[in-house]
Amino acid sequence: MDIETRGTGPLRVVAIHGIQGTRSSWMPVVETLADAATWVLPNLRGRGGSIVPRDARDYALGRYADDLEAAIRACCMDATFVLAGWSMGVSVILEYLRRQGAPRPAGLVLASGTDCLAQTSWFKSDGEQLLREAADRERRLGLREAADHAAVAGTWRCIRKLDHRGSLAAIPEPAIVIHGSDDPDSPVAHGLRLASGLQQASRHIIAGAGHGVLTENTAEVSDQIRRFLDSISPAATHNPETVK
């Protein structure tokens, strides 16, 4: 698996990119917070140097959760860790947290996500038109690096009917939900509902911001994440516990 680490802080943060991005989506925040955490930055399947599935079913959200678990087990079993997701990365985290026996994080950073992919319209078409929509959305979000359009299309076909609303109340970890007030991809109502559904979540709404808060609102997002990480104790006694 293609994983890069950055930073020197005592906490580890596993940061998950969105449906069209790569780990580069997180780089503006990572560069700002290099002193606050050691960042574990995987490229999920179909991106960067990670595997490219031959079977379209391997773009299911559960397989992305496999990638996340592999990154955690490779890089975080000896340290306190936080999970951070942007856009689809939030959905990957929510899917991962449904698992029994998986290492649990000390906290969650959930940016520009949704608790119900079935109620989003990231793409409206299929076939060749979906590929064109993916190219248009990539340009709109100003992604530094982008996933192959076929990988994006295959992923969307697998995940577009998913709904995590029913599992939120079972998530005990502290969380911060960061969302743009004018997000056209994951409307702010999704972020508010996500924060309300979790057991203990704070929320920070960025006035006038859209979907690309990591790159367009880096300073404000980084400030909120720093405050949240400061609230998570990187105690040497911490072990990633599993849910039995």
How should each PLM-predicted stretch be described?
Residues 184-190:
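Conserved alpha/beta-hydrolase "acid-adjacent" motif
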Residues 171, 177-179:
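Short beta-strand/loop motif that positions the catalytic acidic residue
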Residues 1-14, 34-38, 77, 106, ...:
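Alpha/beta-hydrolase fold catalytic core
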Residues 140-166, 182:
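Hydrophobic, aromatic-rich cap/lid helix
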Residues 2-55:
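Conserved HGGG/HGGXW glycine-rich cap/lid loop of the alpha/beta-hydrolase fold
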